[in-house]
A protein has these predicted regions:
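Residues forming anionic-ligand binding surfaces in small-molecule and nucleic-acid pockets
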Residues: 126, 204, 414, 524-540, ...
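Acidic, proline/glycine-enriched N-terminal capping motif
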Residues: 439, 446-578, 583
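Short acidic-hydrophobic surface loop/beta-edge motif
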Residues: 1, 176, 500-501, 575-578, ...
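Short amphipathic beta-strand starts and helix->beta connectors
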Residues: 344, 378-381, 525-532, 577-587, ...
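Residues forming the flavin
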Residues: 1-484, 635, 849
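Conserved, structured C-terminal
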Residues: 486-490, 494-496, 508, 594-596, ...
Length: 873
């Protein structure tokens, strides 16, 4: 883990981190310290922790008992927590279009960039390492001179070069995404690049060798040992033992000798090598390491010939292994490329060209072009001829997956390479199997009598290397990615001591608690007061969409289950929206302002979803309809006045007498002007009381709230929060989409199927409502529940279970539940199989081991005749 506090970054790869003054680093999975790691004791009991042990070892007393310890031991880092505050660093994002993008700055990548630039193309080259050259940069002074010459040539040709910038994904429509470690004022930059042509020149990964105890500290890839020596002047050991199955081991030996590092010997799996041995270095051909010695560091190795007759004990403080090369085909595969197995070279290489994508150099399996020695081709037999020696042979060094785990997966029939990956966690660490995959595929093939192409590879997915969430998010964090919306009357609610909560990305008052009141107590008081006098509620977040055009009425008939084209001007109607599967996804009131203009209300959290659905159908299916859809939620505020004294309050405020209940009917809309402000007043109610929804320009919302509050003091007005509204709508049995519905709810389940058969016009989802499953008489239906004892509140989520109870078939579940202050007893809504035919029946609902007796009742619970919402109470 790197950094402290809010800058802490977990699970970083040490080999990717450049040393710098002030660097803070700590081990990710050593406890209590690296010097004494209790987790290392697990190595003494390998039989207890085989592949998939968590599925079969800890069966008692239960997984939850072991889970915390196992997760802590898994090696995961610790991210910055809530107590450390927000990340203080800045992240940038840049979009760019070029003709040619070259991913990789080795010799092959530089040559490809130069050729493209000389052809007159705009070229961008990105290299993940801090310097260009790849493998060639570590080949002594001559190699660095060649890289410098190519870099100068690229600059002269006009190639734009960025080092420390890794292309980590190729996506559809020629999109490449890269991440750059910037430093200074910007920590990381995300690049989004559209290129007409992309050249993949990512080189190749060196493979480790497989031998017992190959996880000891000091066992390293030979190319890494060479790069440390050549590029940073760091000797990874004073006496280095080289083991290889290809000629690159000999080149590393020469480089180490030139740097003054003693080379103990070269252990070559092969009987012959094209490269000459450095002078004075013993070479053990047709031999293999069968044991690495040492505990906290390597002290030596045991080498045995393939014939079993020769044995050498070699002292060394570093073992450098060169098991051959694996082309870095990740980006090519992400773009849809298929791989083929090159038997001669024992590697997977690109099978064919892709439109707009070229693969060059070692990445294409062309080791000569990639300046990797031509004979670096490991023998598949050498990979699998391990014999059985004491000690674990690790295939994935980061996730501690051994060859015995691969064998176990094969025995337990996890033969698919994807199953092997997930069962053993092979290739699931931060390197995503870049060094381990081919060795594992060869081993699995040996255990299942299959060739590597028959075993296949796992699917390569972005990102190519670990990328921080911060880099992907860029500046889109906090309220920049999810703005917390404040209502136009926010300050008025603050002055009333509103208790704010987030509802569908809006900051809204849940209630207005008085001194010593809980949220529930405040909601009960407010609900009761609204029923007695009058309440003020701001409904500005309510979704508002204007739909207009010559075909607007016909279009809404297609969108809604109900018929909207028959609405008269000034009329309003409740409607539900369903998707192609017939599932209810929103509801609201539609009012007609003119023959070709409609005012559409949706739920507060569903307005974007509804607007997008309207646009999708207009643009993709109903393209001939002359209709415009305009979301106007933020442009209009909403002040809802409801209760027996609602009209008295509006009358005191001087609003038009045409709004009086005796003149303006329920579910009608009037457009008026009051005090110079244009208003759209809708007679509607979500709480069962006489109600007026006053829609007005958002900037005038607080003015109206303050005026009505001032006048309402003589009428015992009360501010009403969301919780009180939920109590009152439950008393009326009104539907709350998303609360009382789920992804299976159809119109018939909530009693909204009346009139469908008579509706002449087609509508979205109609055919789905004719499927056998939709017509099943056993479907769940929305009904009311009351506790038999009339005292116990039924928990939301409690399940109705068929007699004699759990674990019997589930018959339904409670969706809404509140204590009714008006009725003096708890009431609930529930989805229940054949619910409407079971009114009067007693059922039992179960929640967390407790059973509750309930009675199925019809809704509404309160004012069943609807006298109050018509102003007749």
């Amino acid at each position: 883990d790197l950094g402290d506090g809010a800058r802490r970054t977990p699970n970083t790869r040490a080999t990717d981190i450049l040393l710098a003054d002030g660097l803070v680093a700590r081990p990710g999975n050593a406890w209590p310290s690296l010097g004494f790691d209790i987790g290392a004791l697990a190595a003494r009991f390998p039989g207890l922790l085989p592949a998939g042990f968590y599925y079969k070892t800890f069966m008692w007393p239960g997984w939850r008992w072991f889970e915390p310890a196992i997760r802590r031991a898994a090696g995961l880092g610790h991210a910055a927590g809530a107590t450390t505050g927000a990340d203080p660093d800045r992240y940038d994002e840049l979009s760019l279009q070029v003709h040619t993008l070259v991913a990789g700055g080795g010799v092959a990548g530089l040559q490809a960039a130069i050729r493209a630039a000389r052809d007159g193309h705009q070229v961008l080259l990105m290299e993940g390492q801090p310097r260009l050259g790849g493998w060639m940069a570590a080949q002594g002074d001559a190699g660095r001179a060649r890289v410098a010459a190519l870099a100068h040539e690229a600059k002269q040709a006009g190639v734009r070069v960025h080092t420390g910038c890794t292309v980590f994904g190729l996506y559809d429509h020629r999109l490449a995404v890269a991440v750059e470690a910037v430093g200074g004022g910007v920590r990381e930059r995300l690049w989004k690049i559209r290129a007409q042509h992309t050249v993949v020149a990512c080189g190749a990964f060196e493979r480790p060798m497989l031998f017992p105890d190959n996880d000891r500290p000091g066992v390293m890839l030979a190319s890494a040992v060479q790069r440390y020596a050549e590029l940073y002047g760091v000797a990874c050991g004073r006496r280095v033992l080289l083991a290889g199955a290809c000629d690159s081991a000999y080149g590393v030996a020469r480089a180490l000798q030139a740097a003054g590092v003693e080379v103990a010997a070269i252990v070559d799996h092969r009987t012959e090598a094209a490269a000459p041995a450095p002078p004075g270095v013993p070479v053990h051909r047709a031999s293999a390491i069968v044991a690495a010695h040492g505990g906290r560091a390597v002290t030596g190795a045991t080498v045995i010939g393939h014939d079993g007759r020769t044995r050498h004990e070699i002292a060394a403080d570093c073992i450098a292994v060169a098991g051959g090369w694996t082309p870095a085909v990740n980006l090519y595969s992400m773009a849809g490329g298929r791989l083929r197995w090159d038997e001669r070279a024992s590697m997977f290489v690109p099978a064919s060209a892709l439109p707009g994508i070229s693969v060059v150099g070692a990445c294409a399996g062309d080791l000569e072009a990639g300046e990797v020695p031509a004979d670096n081709r490991p023998s598949a037999a050498a990979l699998s001829a391990l014999g059985r020696r004491p000690g674990k042979v690790f295939v994935d060094l980061q996730n501690d997956v051994a060859d015995s785990d691969v064998a176990l997966a094969a025995r337990e029939n996890y033969r698919s390479v994807e199953h092997l990956k997930r069962y053993t966690t092979l290739g699931m660490a931060t390197d995503q199997g870049k060094t381990s995959n081919v060795n594992a595929i060869v081993l699995m093939g040996g255990h299942t009598q299959r060739t590597p192409p028959q075993v296949g590879t796992t699917k390569f997915r972005p990102p190519f290397k670990p990328v921080t969430i911060n880099a992907i998010a860029g500046s889109r964090s906090g309220e920049r990615i999810k703005p917390l919306r404040r209502m136009p009357g926010h300050d008025w609610h603050v002055a009333r001591q509103g208790l704010f909560e987030e509802f569908g990305s809006w900051l809204r008052p849940a209630a207005y608690p008085r001194h010593g009141e809980s949220l529930a107590q405040a909601a009960q008081r407010e609900a009761l007061q609204v029923r007695r006098t009058v309440g003020l509620f701001e409904g500005s977040p309510l979704g508002k969409i204007e739909v207009f055009g010559p075909d607007a009425a016909d279009f809404l008939d297609l969108m809604y289950v109900g018929t909207m084209s028959t609405l008269p001007v000034g009329g309003a109607r409740y409607g539900i929206l369903i998707d192609e599967n017939g599932v209810v996804f929103d509801d609201g009131i539609v009012a007609r302002m003119a023959p070709d203009r409609f005012w559409v209300n949706t739920t507060s959290g569903g307005v974007e979803r509804v607007a997008l659905a309207f646009e999708e159908w207009l643009q993709c299916e109903y393209v001939r309809h002359r209709v415009l859809v305009t979301p106007v939620t933020s442009a209009w505020g909403n002040v809802t006045v409801s209760g027996p004294r609602a009209w008295a309050l509006l009358e005191a405020a001087g609003l038009d007498a045409a709004l009086a209940p005796c003149t303006m009917k329920h579910m009608t809309l009037r457009e008026i002007e009051h005090a110079g402000t244009r208003m759209r007043v809708l007679r509607a109610s979500f709480n069962g009381e006489l109600g007026y929804e006053i829609n007005l320009p958002a900037q005038q919302t607080q003015v109206l709230l303050e005026r009505l509050w001032e006048l309402g003091q003589d009428l015992d007005a009360v501010p009403c929060g969301i919780e009180a509204l939920m109590v009152m709508r439950t008393e009326k049995g009104y539907l709350h989409v998303g609360g009382d519905t789920d992804g299976t709810t159809l119109p018939g389940d909530i009693g909204m199927d009346r009139g469908i058969a008579k509706k002449a016009a087609n509508f979205v989802g109609r055919r789905s409502l004719l499927r056998p499953a939709a017509l099943d008489p056993q479907r769940m239906q929305l009904v009311g529940l009351v506790p038999v004892d009339r005292r116990t509140k039924l928990p939301v989520g409690a399940h109705a279970v068929a007699p004699p109870g759990p674990p019997g078939p589930i018959e339904g579940f409670v969706t809404s539940s509140h204590h009714s202050p008006s009725l003096g007893l708890p009431v609930a809504l529930a989805m229940l199989q054949r619910g409407r035919s079971r009114v009067g029946e007693r059922i039992t609902v179960h929640h967390l081991g407790t059973a509750f007796a309930a009675e199925v009742v019809a809704t509404p619970f309160f004012d069943p005749q609807g006298e109050r919402l018509h102003g007749r109470a």
